Amino acid sequence: MYSLPGATMSAAPARVISSSSSSSFVEPLLLAAASSAAANSHHQVRQRGHLVRTLAASSSSNTLLRSDFDLQEGLTTDVKRMLRQRQKKSGGGREMLVTIDNLKRLCIDHFFEEEIEGAMATGACTRLLHSDDLFDATLAFRLLREAGHDVSAKEDVLRRFIDGVSGDFKLSLNNDVRGLLGLHDMSHLDVGGEEAALLHRAKEFSSSHLASAVRYQDNPSLAEYVRQSLDHPYHLSLTQYKARHHLRYLQSLPSSCRDAAVERLAVAEFQLNKSLHQREMREIKRWWMDLGLAEEIPVVRDQVMKWYMWSMAALQGSSFSRYRVYVVDDIFDLVGTLEELSAFTEAVKMWDTAAADSLPSCMRSCYKALHTVTNEIAEIAHKEHGSNPINRLRKAWVVLFDGFMVEARWLATDQVPTAEDYLRNGVVTSGVPLTFLHIFSMLGYDDPSTEEEEEAIIDHMPSIISCPAKILRLWDDMGSAEDEAQEGFDGSYRDFYLMENPSRSPGEAEAHMRGLIAREWVELNRECFCRRTFPSDIAQVCLNTARMVSVMYSYNKEQRLLVLEDYAAMMLVL
């Protein structure tokens, strides 16, 4: 299931599944946030559009204690004072960069953007990049690359730590746990090119020696921190999830190595965000019950918390709270014949509620909700940012349903697509492009000035959108989505790849798919850190979405999502 903020959204699986050619299950329609869709005559609920306007008008902080925000503001002032003193004392050297890294890892760096930018501009970070200390050099590299600076992993850092005779990493690094952690973090910021092979070696070297360090480490807190870093690499993991573990590690250090004000601010931020998420969750559950679709359509899956987790992960921070609420989406199975699905698609193209009158009851309700929610989101974007994205959003819906129809026709005609064709279409039917377009509109991303530019983002999908979509589709298709409980043939990339390569085993197919996922991460890194075509908040949404995928689809042997359970407990449970 897929749920994201700022827009309506479609299911990750979003594929045609059936055991006969005359009918199909399609996981499409995302119904977002407090929709004002007309309820069926037998459902007596309040006008759902009112909830959207109520939430938009009210501040998310109203239900939180003023004293909590006063505490947060006071702690922020304390940390800013400390940063200025540290900058003046060290000129932005190692101590300052370690503090910046801690602020980022604790998800409180947004309070100190000006101070961080000032420290990065001093040149101290560049000087540290050329240090002979592995920890210093890898930390400086990561901070510079994340900020979009042009740095070379090979020339600026790694060549100094490679033995000139053997060509391997120096043996003296084997016991440098902090340096190895930095090397491991750095290795995941691969943007391809000449550095790719060396960063891959750095990843293997650091992983191997860190695994040994865990076994022989006499410091339990450090051992757990290393284990967490290996299981959940910093760049590939949700920063909110990693933040709690990082704080726990910082709190285990000697008092002389700790920043008390930073830790207190992190705790205050965690508590405020948890209260905010709990409030949002209550509103979402209320909206879902009012919508009544779980009763109206028997196959609808009622997993509101899981859907909300997508929204919470992609748009992090209290400033995005309104958009998370607008976007609470659902993915539900829509049962229908090929002809009915075609009629539904045509109704979407017409974008007129009257066009849905001939549809079956459940489809009609879904269509009207979809129509109303999308128009509401367009109105919100228009009011806040001055341009109305409705034409772009309408076309995005048409593209999505055209993709669904491609899959429906494959099934109805017993056509077996190539793995490549399936994946190309699966990027669209993942729902990620549609959702991102809604998010871009909600966040006020520059409205294209011409119709040609407006259509380009849909017809010629940029990698910042296609990469998370492919990552999601491939993860889901590796067979880990056991909770979908779907019957019939479940066409997937792995199925079609094995049909094309009968000599390959399922394990080899999975290894191939993991390789494709790694390749998409490299391309996503290149877009976010090198090209930087999109604003940083848009890039962060796309990175967070890609990071959330493994959380949603990594099942253990008992078919439980342990990381998701842990993350939900951290962010939502009292």
UniProtKB/Swiss-Prot annotation:
Positions annotated to bind substrate: R301, D329, D333, R473
Any one GO molecular function term: magnesium ion binding
Protein's GO biological process: regulation of defense response; response to wounding; terpenoid biosynthetic process
Keywords carried by this UniProt record: Chloroplast, Lyase, Magnesium, Manganese, Metal-binding, Plastid, Transit peptide
Taxonomy, superkingdom: Eukaryota
Residues bound to Mg(2+) 3: D476, S480, E484
Gene3D superfamilies on file: Farnesyl Diphosphate Synthase (1.10.600.10), Terpene synthase, N-terminal domain (1.50.10.130)
Subunit (UniProt): Monomer.
Name of the protein: Probable terpene synthase 3, chloroplastic
